[in-house]
């Protein structure tokens, strides 16, 4: 039986992943978040452990990783690079090697055209953290990280997405949280997929200068 550590477990996409893993697998889940009471509804489940902690706290991260098989990070914010360094330090200390890392479109300067220009301005406060995180992970060959770069997120009840590689221009402008969660669940179920890779996720046929709802 595997055990999965989910960092940033309160995030909407992460909660979709949690529910699907509980329904579709026998994996044990360690849910790491700043305020554990936010996910108290999972407390009665014997397969779930709630861990209250700061993503910068290397000692707490190290303790949380002690017996897990896969680390899935859904952290974000302007301090992301600091969080990423803490994750790397904890993984090296515990000998953990498999990481699923939620990044963002633009992390590799891969978004072309007017949408790329718009995206640079729309999330300019956050892109440095995503880009520095990509560099930090690239410098750790012993950590098998699959980085995800989703398009702008929707709450549409659909699973409809395509992937682009790290050397390919990004496609589309949007993707549903359900779609991103679906891909994360596939990686957790089959951790040998997409080793040492960075993948864009988008809904097909959503090209444009910005997401359609803006």
What name fits each language-model region?
Residues 3, 69-70, 98:
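Structural motif
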Residues 4-24:
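N-terminal Rossmann NAD(P)H-binding glycine-rich loop of SDR-like oxidoreductase domains
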Residues 7-12, 127-128, 139, 145, ...:
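Active-site-lining helix/loop region of Rossmann-like oxidoreductase modules
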Residues 10, 35, 105:
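Residues in the short beta-alpha loop(s) of Rossmann-like NAD(P)-binding domains
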Residues 25-34:
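Conserved glycine-rich Rossmann-like NAD(P)H-binding loop of the short-chain dehydrogenase/reductase
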Residues 33-38, 150-152:
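Short, polar loop motifs at secondary-structure junctions
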Residues 37-93:
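NAD(P)H-binding glycine-rich loop region in Rossmannoid oxidoreductase-like domains
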Residues 79-164:
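Glycine-/Pro-rich loop/turn segments that contact NAD(P) or position catalytic residues
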């Amino acid at each position: 039986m595997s055990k999965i550590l989910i960092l940033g477990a309160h995030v909407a996409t992460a909660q979709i992943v949690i529910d699907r893993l509980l329904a579709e697998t026998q994996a044990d889940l360690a849910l790491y978040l700043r305020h554990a009471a936010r996910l108290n509804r999972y407390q009665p489940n014997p397969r779930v452990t709630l861990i209250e902690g700061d993503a910068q706290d290397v000692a707490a991260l190290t303790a949380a990783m002690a017996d897990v098989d896969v680390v899935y990070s859904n952290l974000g914010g302007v301090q992301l690079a600091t969080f990423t360094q803490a994750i790397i330090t904890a993984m090296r200390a515990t000998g953990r090697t498999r990481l699923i890392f939620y990044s963002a479109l633009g992390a590799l300067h891969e978004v072309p055209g007017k949408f790329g220009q718009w995206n640079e301005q729309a999330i300019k406060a956050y892109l440095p953290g995503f880009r520095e995180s990509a560099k930090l992970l690239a410098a750790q060959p012993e950590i098998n990280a699959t980085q995800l770069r989703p398009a702008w997120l929707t709450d549409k009840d659909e699973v409809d997405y395509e992937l682009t590689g790290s050397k390919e221009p990004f496609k589309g402008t949007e993707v549903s949280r359900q779609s991103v969660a679906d891909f994360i669940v596939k990686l957790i179920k089959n951790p040998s997929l997409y080793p040492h890779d960075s993948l864009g996720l988008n809904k097909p046929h959503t090209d444009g200068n910005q997401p359609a709802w803006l």
